[in-house]
Amino acid sequence: MSQPAKVLLLYAHPESQDSVANRVLLKPAIQHNNVTVHDLYARYPDFFIDTPYEQALLREHDVIVFQHPLYTYSCPALLKEWLDRVLSRGLASGPGGNQLVGKYWRSVITTGEPESAYRYDALNRYPMSDVLRPFELTAAMCRMHWMPPIIVYWARRQSPQTLASHAKAYGEWLANPVSAGGY
């Protein structure tokens, strides 16, 4: 039996203590031996990112999960800083920038609005696939495989049962993240 892929779960929430949905989603992740949960706000409260350390973590893992709330159609500030500093030339692009080729990228997003708000004729004017396009393009720049995102819409209004269902499916996916199908 082959080993499951090694997963680096980059968790970026500046107010993690207030996010019930993200705490529920993290529970199954910490139970898997193949998953490294890396809380960026806990590690870098001053925003001074240890780029060589972060790049070494990326090299050691097969699947990179970016779990965060959707903030102003993007990610929290520290994750944006992380993306700009860590996914630099020589690692992810440019000469020698082939170190992430073939790895997998998956975004796991919580939102404060319902799915119906993400349509061309709705409040946000664009579907979530358009909103997340910069992340998909970043994965392409790194020559990583873009996996369909996991999105928990209107996260703070979901029932405990619904959040538990999302967490269960997420945990099952984390156990074997590059299998066919998946969550």
Swiss-Prot record:
EC number: 1.6.5.2
GO MF annotation terms: electron transfer activity; FMN binding; NADH:ubiquinone reductase (non-electrogenic) activity; NADPH dehydrogenase (quinone) activity
Membrane topology type: Peripheral membrane protein
Keyword terms: Cell inner membrane, Cell membrane, Membrane, NAD, Oxidoreductase
One term under GO cellular component: plasma membrane
Domain of life: Bacteria
InterPro entries: Flavodoxin_fold (IPR003680), Flavoprotein-like_sf (IPR029039), K_H_efflux_KefG (IPR023947), KefG/KefF (IPR046980)
Entry keyword Iron-sulfur: no
Pfam families per the UniProt record, alphabetical: Flavodoxin_2
Protein location: Cell inner membrane
Catalytic reaction list: a quinone + NADH + H(+) = a quinol + NAD(+); a quinone + NADPH + H(+) = a quinol + NADP(+)
One of the GO biological process terms: positive regulation of potassium ion transmembrane transport
Similarity comment: Belongs to the NAD(P)H dehydrogenase (quinone) family. KefG subfamily.
Role this protein plays: Regulatory subunit of a potassium efflux system that confers protection against electrophiles. Required for full activity of KefB.
Self-association and partners: Interacts with KefB.
Listed name of the protein: Glutathione-regulated potassium-efflux system ancillary protein KefG
Species of origin: Salmonella gallinarum (strain 287/91 / NCTC 13346)
Lineage: Bacteria, Pseudomonadati, Pseudomonadota, Gammaproteobacteria, Enterobacterales
Gene that this sequence comes from: kefG
